[in-house]
Amino acid sequence: MSPSATVFDIGGNAVGTLQLVGHLFDSDPNLHLIHQVVVAQQAAFRQGTHKTKSRAEVSGSGRKPFRQKGTGNARCGSTRAPQMRGGGVVHGPVPRSYVHRTPKKMIKAALAGCLTNRARAGRVHIVDSFGDTPSVADALTLFQITGLSSKLLVVAQASDSVAYRSVRNIPGVRLVHVGQLNSYDVLRSDDVLFTRGAYNVFVGPSGDLAFSEDRDNPGTSLPKSPTPEDSSDATKARSSRHDDRTGA
């Protein structure tokens, strides 16, 4: 039986329980997969703009600093050599991208594993809404009465400005919209609080994870692939336009 979550109102009163979707909140966590996805996410945070100058890029003369023999020093042909003061850096960092390609199925499986860990520990909760007007005091009251941890992840819809303005200044509370929910934020938070609307969007109408860039627009769909009939019609149209131009 999949875990359940307590549903609260903005006053902190329990108004019911909700059976969580099994394959999202009661899966088999793969620790290696979660680690791989989190490392890829942290690597994507890096800008990769680091840069040092090589001996070909540093400023300096090409003149030989001293004669080849007779000084007792090791021979040297340039003041831009790595061992010289002000010389170039050998094998230094150069601008690069740290992005790891991570398939969507892996990202989805890792997120389900993280949510499963929190759900089995009773740390996934749902609130009806944050009210009609933003109120930091009401949000603090909700967190205190329900005993939510100071490390809290709030998941709301992108259009829910009331939730955003109610919790944005509370220390230790991070708010993300449904399209931003990820494994790293779930792991770094002790409790996860969904608004009811965000939970419905997250699981989708069929009880499946609506994993897309815009989960708040379920009507968005990909263009339909052309059929052989469409290709034939397009060929006929091009042929007709060609005949009109040539006067045939």
Curated annotation (Swiss-Prot):
Keywords: Ribonucleoprotein, Ribosomal protein, RNA-binding, rRNA-binding. One of its GO terms (molecular function) is structural constituent of ribosome. Transmembrane segments: none annotated. Signal peptide: none annotated. The keyword Ribosomal protein applies. GO terms for cellular component: ribonucleoprotein complex; ribosome. Residues 48-95, 210-248 are annotated as: Disordered. InterPro entries: Ribosomal_uL4, Ribosomal_uL4-like, Ribosomal_uL4_dom_sf. Gene3D superfamilies: 3.40.1370.10. One of its GO terms (biological process) is translation. Residues 233-248 have a biased composition (Basic and acidic residues). Pfam families: Ribosomal_L4. Part of the 50S ribosomal subunit. Belongs to the universal ribosomal protein uL4 family. One of the primary rRNA binding proteins, this protein initially binds near the 5'-end of the 23S rRNA. It is important during the early stages of 50S assembly. It makes multiple contacts with different domains of the 23S rRNA in the assembled 50S subunit and ribosome. Forms part of the polypeptide exit tunnel. This is Large ribosomal subunit protein uL4. It comes from Tropheryma whipplei (strain TW08/27). The lineage of its organism: Bacteria, Bacillati, Actinomycetota, Actinomycetes, Micrococcales.
